[in-house]
A protein has these predicted regions:
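C-terminal region/appendage detector
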Residues: 1-257
């Protein structure tokens, strides 16, 4: 019996791995490596969660703006992911997502890692917006059964996929299962920009955290939210501090390491 094909959703912030037929990823981890300063040990993917003190971590990401720039780092992360899900790469095929704007040179580098380093039997390359458009089309038709093909046949619907990533936001129109490349728009605004803004706020007002991106990212995930009523939330926060003894509904404390 042939091994189930592996599905590799390779994002700039996280990497998600599973198998065809799964309704959710079997393994999700940060798509980066990190090394504590003045130490030789390198933490790969989810190993970052194993340390309590996130201060002074030097983070290396294999993707910048959704484009592969460090193949060696990416190989180490993928190897960790495949081991965690029990994927026998020499006996399996793989479907990997990529940026809709990925140049041919980057696609070639990705293939070299998959075939030369991991020795996969075959590879299916899929632009991430197409996966989203296909999933929406299947849900609209009431097809919630996994494993019935990646793209539904005879897609006639038009979709607009907005991908808000780590370092950029890409807007892709998809018609009949194909991206309209002339209509693709990209802006360099993503989660990383918000983390940088939070870093500036904290550094200017409280404590210099210009080199503590990992801590700030964790702080952002735990304490920040997208306001549905901005005016009301700002009014609720106005003048309510712990020192005045009148902490508002959004007041929170976070202890730095």
């Amino acid at each position: 019996m042939d091994a189930l094909p592996c599905v590799l959703d390779n994002g700039s912030y996280e990497v998600r791995v599973g198998f065809c037929g799964d309704t959710s990823p079997r393994f999700v981890a940060p798509n980066c490596t990190a090394r504590p300063r003045q130490q030789l040990r390198v933490l790969v993917a989810d190993e970052i969660h194993s340390i309590k003190n996130l201060a002074q971590l030097e983070v290396t990401r294999p993707l910048e703006h959704g484009i592969l720039v460090n193949a060696g780092c990416q190989k180490d992360i993928w190897e960790r992911c495949f081991d965690e899900v029990g994927c026998e790469t020499r006996e399996s095929k793989v479907m990997v997502t990529e940026s809709v704007l990925a140049p041919p040179s980057v696609q070639q580098t990705t293939d070299e890692v998959l075939f030369e380093d991991f020795e996969f039997l075959g590879r299916c390359r899929m632009a991430a917006p197409l996966c989203v458009a296909a999933a929406v089309a299947q849900l609209d038709r009431g097809n919630r059964t996994p494993g019935e093909g990646i793209l539904p046949r005879n897609i006639e619907e038009a979709s607009l996929v907005v991908d808000c990533g780590l370092a950029a936001t890409t807007i892709t129109p998809v018609v009949a299962g194909s991206p309209i490349r002339s209509g693709i728009r990209r802006i360099d605004i993503g989660g990383q920009l918000l983390t940088g803004y939070l870093r500036d706020l904290v550094s200017y007002r409280q404590y210099n955290m210009s080199n503590e991106c990992v801590i700030l990212d964790k702080l952002k995930k735990h304490l920040c939210f997208v306001s549905q009523e901005p005016k009301e939330d700002l009014t609720a926060c106005d003048g309510t501090t712990h020192e005045r003894g009148a902490a508002g509904p959004h007041y929170a404390e976070y202890v730095l390491p």
